Amino acid sequence: MLIPKENRKAIHQALFSQGVLVAKKDFNLPKHPEVGVPNLQVIKACQSLDSRGYLKTRYNWGWFYYTLTNEGVEYLREYLHLPAEVVPATHKRQVRPTAPRAGRPEPRERASADAGYRRAEKKDEGAAPSGFAPSFRGGFGRPQ
């Protein structure tokens, strides 16, 4: 499908900035909500990138989910003339705040009454006698 260069560039920029793109399976939708180009052009451009191995496509409940592969990141970086330091949002490490370790209270010891029931010694009261030999005799009134 022939897609104007500015539309193709807008699709590639949106895909590279986030690393993922979602498109509704509606070929008659006048504009894609995120990119601003016709939805058919978004789907076909992503289909083209998928056939070359630059995207992974998932389809679920009427929506296409496109995810960039590592080869796709390299291809779009070259296509959009971006430096190697620029990466999609999905490839960036998220910095999580660490909780302070010093503020935690020490674990308390269990009460002695609690320890007696938790660590009771095991007894062999429930074992069968040494001469016990079970045998199968049929069952439920069936002949042997």
From Swiss-Prot:
Subcellular location(s) of the protein: Cytoplasm
Coiled coil region boundaries: none
Signal peptide extent: none
Keywords, alphabetical: Cytoplasm, Ribonucleoprotein, Ribosomal protein
InterPro entries in the cross-refs: Plectin_eS10_N, Ribosomal_eS10, WH-like_DNA-bd_sf
Region spans: Disordered: 90-144
GO CC term, one of those recorded: cytosol
The keyword Magnesium is annotated on this UniProt entry: no
UniProt keyword annotation of Cell cycle present: no
Biological processes per GO annotation: cytoplasmic translation
MF annotations from Gene Ontology: RNA binding; structural constituent of ribosome
Pfam family, one: S10_plectin
Skewed-composition ranges (Basic and acidic residues): 103-126
Subunit-level organization: Component of the small ribosomal subunit (SSU). Mature yeast ribosomes consist of a small (40S) and a large (60S) subunit. The 40S small subunit contains 1 molecule of ribosomal RNA (18S rRNA) and at least 33 different proteins. The large 60S subunit contains 3 rRNA molecules (25S, 5.8S and 5S rRNA) and at least 46 different proteins. eS10 interacts with GCN1 (via middle region); this interaction is direct and promotes GCN2 kinase activity.
Family, as annotated: Belongs to the eukaryotic ribosomal protein eS10 family.
Function: Component of the ribosome, a large ribonucleoprotein complex responsible for the synthesis of proteins in the cell. The small ribosomal subunit (SSU) binds messenger RNAs (mRNAs) and translates the encoded message by selecting cognate aminoacyl-transfer RNA (tRNA) molecules. The large subunit (LSU) contains the ribosomal catalytic site termed the peptidyl transferase center (PTC), which catalyzes the formation of peptide bonds, thereby polymerizing the amino acids delivered by tRNAs into a polypeptide chain.
Any further remark recorded for this protein: There are 2 genes for eS10 in S.pombe.
Name of the protein this chain belongs to: Small ribosomal subunit protein eS10A
Organism from which the protein derives: Schizosaccharomyces pombe (strain 972 / ATCC 24843)
Taxonomic path: Eukaryota, Fungi, Dikarya, Ascomycota, Taphrinomycotina
